[in-house]
């Protein structure tokens, strides 16, 4: 039988310690065709070019 790392008495320790944050209400994301349209505009229309390359998530320091 395989060994476990630590005793099972400590299972879920970190989750019980973290403070509960209520989920905020956000506007609903478009579904289906509308979502694909949003992705197209994000990727190909508002292109972020850095050093001649497309960056998906450029940081604020990148010009």
From Swiss-Prot:
A GO term, aspect molecular function: structural constituent of ribosome
Cell division as UniProt keyword: no
Keywords for this protein: Cytoplasm, Phosphoprotein, Ribonucleoprotein, Ribosomal protein
Keyword Lipid biosynthesis listed: no
InterPro entries (alphabetical): Ribosomal_eS30
Positions of region (Disordered): 1-35
Compartments, as annotated in UniProt: Cytoplasm
A Gene Ontology biological process term: cytoplasmic translation
GO cellular component, one term: cytoplasmic stress granule
Other comments on record: Present with 37600 molecules/cell in log phase SD medium. There are 2 genes for eS30 in yeast.
Membership in a protein family: Belongs to the eukaryotic ribosomal protein eS30 family.
Subunit structure: Component of the small ribosomal subunit (SSU). Mature yeast ribosomes consist of a small (40S) and a large (60S) subunit. The 40S small subunit contains 1 molecule of ribosomal RNA (18S rRNA) and 33 different proteins (encoded by 57 genes). The large 60S subunit contains 3 rRNA molecules (25S, 5.8S and 5S rRNA) and 46 different proteins (encoded by 81 genes).
Physiological role: Component of the ribosome, a large ribonucleoprotein complex responsible for the synthesis of proteins in the cell. The small ribosomal subunit (SSU) binds messenger RNAs (mRNAs) and translates the encoded message by selecting cognate aminoacyl-transfer RNA (tRNA) molecules. The large subunit (LSU) contains the ribosomal catalytic site termed the peptidyl transferase center (PTC), which catalyzes the formation of peptide bonds, thereby polymerizing the amino acids delivered by tRNAs into a polypeptide chain.
Name of the protein in question: Small ribosomal subunit protein eS30A
Lineage of origin: Eukaryota, Fungi, Dikarya, Ascomycota, Saccharomycotina
């Amino acid at each position: 039988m395989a060994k476990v790392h630590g005793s099972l008495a400590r299972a879920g320790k970190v989750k019980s310690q973290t403070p509960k944050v209520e989920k905020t209400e956000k506007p609903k994301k478009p579904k289906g065709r509308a979502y694909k349209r949003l992705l197209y505009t994000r990727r190909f229309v508002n292109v972020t070019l850095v050093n001649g390359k497309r960056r998906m998530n450029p940081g604020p320091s990148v010009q």
